[in-house]
């Protein structure tokens, strides 16, 4: 289906799935470092998680390099009572600074995703571009960057094109979905994806844009339409 729709990669696969994508003629655009039910909630904003997260990335980054997977995802984590936002940011900087040298050595980029806490991920700490940029700008590694999810940030803050133009140097990967609903990129939702894709292209971005919508009708038709809209 992906190849028929004009898609060249599949996003968010685990290491034991990367070969399946390759055999189908597809790249894995972003890989997972682990299978955990608490993957989103348990992130770098809590120092108690660092040993676990660093171990997962230390195992996965060399495998990703050998497999040709350019990005591996990580999460900021959920809020906790008694921990301020700044303490969470500081913890992220400390933990990610420890893994950045290995990411640079392997040439694999760790991408951290901001999510909306309003609709889909209540309690998630990094629910703004400001939070994400505060972290990666302090880590200051070309291999620790952000996954800018257009849907999630439209829910939380809007102003998508201006944000891309202002902060694109920190963005290594993008996700799409329609808003409201997180469904197809069609006329029932508010985001103007051709204009957004032109703004991304104008920054010189040469990575992947991944479609992460929940289909409400024929999935292949929705994917074809998304590819058509975003091909600028």
Give names to the regions the model predicted.
Residues 1-20, 60, 68:
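Catalytic domains of carbohydrate-active enzymes, especially glycoside hydrolases
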Residues 43-145, 155:
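Active-site acidic/histidine proton-transfer and metal-coordination neighborhood
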Residues 9-11, 29-30, 73, 111, ...:
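Conserved beta-strand positions in the central sheet of alpha/beta enzyme cores
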Residues 14-16, 34-36, 77-80, 114-118, ...:
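Active-site-proximal loop/turn and secondary-structure-junction residues that shape catalytic pockets
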Residues 15-26, 82, 191:
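Active-site-adjacent beta->alpha loops and helix N-cap segments on the catalytic face
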Residues 1-4, 68-70, 126-148, 152-232:
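Histidine-acidic metal/acid-base catalytic patches
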Residues 7, 26, 69, 108, ...:
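Short glycine/serine/threonine/alanine-rich loop segments
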């Amino acid at each position: 289906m992906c190849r028929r729709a004009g898609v060249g990669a599949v996003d968010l696969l685990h290491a034991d799935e990367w070969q399946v994508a390759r055999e189908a003629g597809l790249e894995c655009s972003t890989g997972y470092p682990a299978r955990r039910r608490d993957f989103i909630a348990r992130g770098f904003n809590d120092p108690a998680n660092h040993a676990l997260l660093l171990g997962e990335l230390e195992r996965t980054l060399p495998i990703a390099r050998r497999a040709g997977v350019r990005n591996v995802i990580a999460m900021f984590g959920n809020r906790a009572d008694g921990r301020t936002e700044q303490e969470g940011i500081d913890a992220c900087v400390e933990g990610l600074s420890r893994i950045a040298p290995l990411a640079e050595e392997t040439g694999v980029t760790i991408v951290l995703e901001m999510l909306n806490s309003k609709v889909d991920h209540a309690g998630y700490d990094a629910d703004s571009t400001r939070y994400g940029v505060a972290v990666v700008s302090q880590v200051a590694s070309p291999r620790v960057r952000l996954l800018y999810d257009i849907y999630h940030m439209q829910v939380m803050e809007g102003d998508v094109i201006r944000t891309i133009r202002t902060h694109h140097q920190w963005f290594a990967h993008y996700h799409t979905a329609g808003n409201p609903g997180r469904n197809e990129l069609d006329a029932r939702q508010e985001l103007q994806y051709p204009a957004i894709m032109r703004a991304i292209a104008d920054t010189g971005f040469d990575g992947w844009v991944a479609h992460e919508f929940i289909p409400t009708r024929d999935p292949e038709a929705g994917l074809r339409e998304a590819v058509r809209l975003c091909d600028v």
